[in-house]
């Protein structure tokens, strides 16, 4: 019997599904193929791993590094055994095949291209009806029923669960990327189902309380931290001073054109490599090696650093990160195959004297900077504050290697490859 191209594409897609459970690579998203899959309007039933963490949470150097990789939670009670897990896998396979068999050949090819590229290549949107009838396809076992009886499934959620994060349970755990046609649209008739046009959301382990007007002293450079160089020194003249209050004219990045909303500096240990990169477009890819890459290519910068560790980390940057300015702030999406580490004044408790370093796994997004919170952290009437650079509009990002209290590196200037992102006022 001859096999059609469509059936071959379906089998190839199923073989490309994300591994689950113990087979999963670190940071890729796991937790087994079973479990409930709720639609957009269903109640949130996220399962959290041991230690109070969850698959969508961001680990930090002072807390538990909760991984979206290893599936420590169990969709079924342990007493259910392998039989229940196998049944859930069979249900998922039957449902996925019933969906894929309804797609046109061109749609299958587009989906396969996105899945096999793992997000490294820009792929088109896969526009499909957003919801799917919950009844299983003809390949389902006799009498098989879904684990939960919602009226319909979210199709983007199903494809993300199959091809990216097997432990995914609810639409509130993912965020659509701004490059997608469905970004910002509410309940469109057709929605993009390309699994690499969505990212997994990082949740802080404990949300910060309301921000006070006159908060923390740790935003000032301190004499007892010689390696914690303030941003004005690190970026060669970039300065943030706020004498007498807040205004656009007082928060300057560099003289001249103010059309850019941030500048990016790339560092290898204590040495800045290349020039400052001014960002004007709403979205910027920062990468070392990216097929069809368009943005800030770190691989093209001339570096004299011969350290084996620096060269090793540099080779792991790969697709890097995506920096996006959106309505609610600035988001960072980890496109690489390794974790990144982020420190930002707007991510943490303003009453703390130490900023946490947040670990962001591959495929995850985090809102790294919030303009309104940054404004509230300034002290315009503080005479001492007026005399020193203020670093609240700066975010630091390290590739692969972390720093802070739980690491041998106490300061980011000891990290092999890292970025300093300095934001303009809007």
Curated annotation (Swiss-Prot):
Binding locations of Zn(2+): 125, 180, 192, 197
Motif position, PY-motif: 208-211
Record-listed Phosphoserine modification sites: 249
Record-linked PROSITE patterns: MH1 (PS51075), MH2 (PS51076)
GO BP, one annotated term: negative regulation of transforming growth factor beta receptor signaling pathway
PTM remark: Phosphorylation on Ser-249 does not affect its stability, nuclear localization or inhibitory function in TGFB signaling; however it affects its ability to regulate transcription. Phosphorylated by PDPK1. Ubiquitinated by WWP1. Polyubiquitinated by RNF111, which is enhanced by AXIN1 and promotes proteasomal degradation. In response to TGF-beta, ubiquitinated by SMURF1; which promotes its degradation.
Region (Disordered), start-end ranges: 13-55
Biased composition (Basic and acidic residues): 37-47
Tissues of expression: Ubiquitous with higher expression in the lung and vascular endothelium.
Residue(s) carrying N6-acetyllysine: 64, 70
UniProt main location, coarse: nucleus
Boundaries of every MH2 domain copy: 261-426
Protein's cellular compartments: Nucleus; Cytoplasm
Annotated MH1 domain residues: 64-207
Keyword Glycoprotein on entry: no
Disease implicated: Colorectal cancer 3: A complex disease characterized by malignant lesions arising from the inner wall of the large intestine (the colon) and the rectum. Genetic alterations are often associated with progression from premalignant lesion (adenoma) to invasive adenocarcinoma. Risk factors for cancer of the colon and rectum include colon polyps, long-standing ulcerative colitis, and genetic family history.
Name listed for the protein in its UniProt record: Mothers against decapentaplegic homolog 7
Species this protein is from: Homo sapiens (Human)
Protein encoded by which gene: SMAD7
């Amino acid at each position: 019997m001859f096999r059609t191209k469509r059936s071959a594409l379906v089998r190839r897609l199923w073989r490309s599904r994300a591994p689950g459970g113990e087979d999963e690579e670190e940071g890729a998203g796991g937790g087994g193929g079973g479990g409930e899959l709720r639609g957009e309007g269903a109640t949130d039933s996220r399962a959290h791993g041991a230690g109070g963490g969850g698959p969508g949470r961001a680990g930090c150097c002072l807390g538990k590094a909760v991984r979206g990789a290893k599936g420590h939670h169990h969709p079924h009670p342990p007493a259910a055994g392998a039989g229940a897990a196998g049944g859930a896998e069979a249900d998922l396979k039957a449902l996925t095949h019933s969906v894929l068999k309804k797609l046109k050949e061109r749609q299958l090819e587009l989906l396969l291209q996105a899945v096999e590229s793992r997000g490294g290549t820009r792929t088109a949107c896969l526009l499909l009806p957003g919801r799917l009838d919950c009844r299983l396809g003809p390949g389902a076992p006799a009498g098989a029923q879904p684990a939960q009886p919602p009226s319909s499934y979210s199709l983007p959620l199903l494809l993300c669960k199959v091809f990216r994060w097997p432990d995914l349970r609810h639409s509130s755990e993912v965020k659509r990327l701004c490059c997608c046609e469905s970004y910002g649209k509410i309940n469109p008739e057709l929605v993009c189902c390309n699994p690499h046009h969505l990212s997994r959301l990082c949740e802080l382990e404990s949300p910060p309380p309301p921000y006070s007007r006159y908060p923390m002293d740790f935003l000032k450079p301190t004499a007892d931290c010689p390696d914690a160089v303030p941003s004005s020194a690190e970026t060669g003249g970039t300065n943030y001073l706020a004498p007498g209050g807040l205004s656009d004219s007082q928060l300057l990045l560099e003289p001249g054109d103010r059309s850019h909303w941030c500048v990016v500096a790339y560092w290898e240990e204590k040495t800045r490599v290349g020039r400052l990169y001014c960002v004007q477009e709403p979205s910027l890819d920062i990468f070392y090696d990216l097929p069809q890459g368009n943005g800030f290519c770190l691989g093209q910068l001339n570096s004299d650093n011969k350290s084996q560790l620096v060269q090793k980390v540099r080779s792991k940057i790969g697709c890097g990160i995506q920096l996006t300015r959106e309505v609610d702030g600035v988001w960072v999406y980890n496109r690489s195959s390794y974790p990144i580490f982020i420190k930002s004044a707007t991510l943490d408790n303003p009453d703390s004297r130490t900023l946490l370093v947040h670990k962001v796994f591959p495929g995850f997004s985090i809102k790294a900077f919030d303009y309104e919170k940054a404004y509230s952290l300034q002290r315009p009437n503080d005479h001492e504050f007026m005399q020193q650079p203020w670093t609240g509009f700066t975010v630091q990002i390290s590739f692969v290697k972390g720093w802070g209290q739980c690491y041998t590196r106490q300061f980011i200037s000891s990290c092999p490859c890292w970025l300093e992102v300095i934001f303009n006022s809007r």
